[in-house]
């Protein structure tokens, strides 16, 4: 079994003479009305796990002008974001919703030569729209998809029960069908690429709470932007995400009541400890 362990993940290196441009730029797109927190969590996770520049883009009309806790995060409208040329990775899906605007934005970014992390409602849109599905399959640059079992079932026109009973086979099928790296979330997350797979052994039931998936997508975007290839970014991100939850539980911060925001800060602590 190909398990992910501390000795086979890659941590981004920080040079003493580095500047913020060396650590990549990542944008997080989503946050429709009622779901702004998803983008907030993902963008904070991207920032705190090392991205040099982080942009947050909300679909909601009631967009915050600044994240008061992390004013380092730059807020841009979805239209303004399209003109940014220095993006190293785009995360699309957290709180995106299923509107026509969401579908149009997803179509735009699927057509761009920039690495994508595709999560949540972006996956639901792809599952329900052949045009979007084909755009993903035809991409020539990095794509990481991060479905939970329900989203995976929709992408494969299957049932969640079947996904859970055949997790490795399902992850491989998703990776092959959509020409992407698949991060099939859940207990023992499976990461699949073409004909290979890896199983994560970190994490616990504390991660079964709102927002932890958004945190993971932000972490993955951050690691890709910092220069890790998509497979290594996925392995490292999933391992650290789960290990952060394990570390918190060891301190009696969870599993009951463990929050996504707590995972972000613990992930930073672990990344620095592994440098």
Region roles according to the model:
Residues 1-117, 124-144, 149-275:
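Small-residue (G/A/S/T)-rich helix-start motifs and N-terminal tracts that mark the onset
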């Amino acid at each position: 079994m190909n398990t992910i362990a501390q000795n086979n993940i890659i941590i981004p290196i920080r040079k003493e003479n580095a500047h913020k441009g060396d650590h990549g730029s990542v944008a997080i797109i989503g946050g429709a009305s009622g779901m702004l927190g998803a983008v907030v969590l993902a963008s904070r996770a991207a920032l705190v796990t090392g991205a040099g520049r982080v942009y947050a883009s909300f679909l909601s009309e009631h967009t915050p002008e600044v994240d008061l806790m992390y004013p380092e995060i730059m807020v841009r409208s979805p239209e303004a974001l399209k003109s940014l040329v220095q993006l190293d990775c785009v995360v699309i899906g957290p709180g995106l919703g299923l509107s026509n605007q969401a579908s149009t934005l997803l179509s735009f970014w699927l057509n761009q030569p920039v690495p994508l992390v595709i999560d949540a409602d972006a996956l639901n849109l792809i599952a329900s729209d052949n045009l979007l599905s084909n755009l993903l399959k035809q991409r020539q640059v990095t794509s990481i998809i991060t479905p939970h079992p329900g989203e995976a079932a929709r992408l494969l026109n299957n049932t969640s029960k079947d996904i859970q009973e055949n997790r490795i086979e399902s992850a491989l099928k998703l990776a092959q069908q959509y020409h992407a790296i698949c991060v099939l979330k859940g207990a023992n997350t499976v990461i699949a690429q073409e004909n290979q797979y890896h199983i994560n052994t970190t994490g616990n039931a504390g991660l079964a709470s709102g927002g932890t998936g958004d945190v993971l997508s932000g972490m993955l975007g951050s690691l890709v932007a910092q220069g890790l290839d998509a497979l290594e970014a996925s392995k490292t991100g999933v391992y650290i995400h789960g290990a952060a939850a394990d570390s918190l539980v060891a301190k009696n911060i969870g599993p009951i009541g463990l929050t996504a925001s707590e995972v972000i800060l613990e992930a930073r602590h672990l990344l620095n400890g592994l440098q």
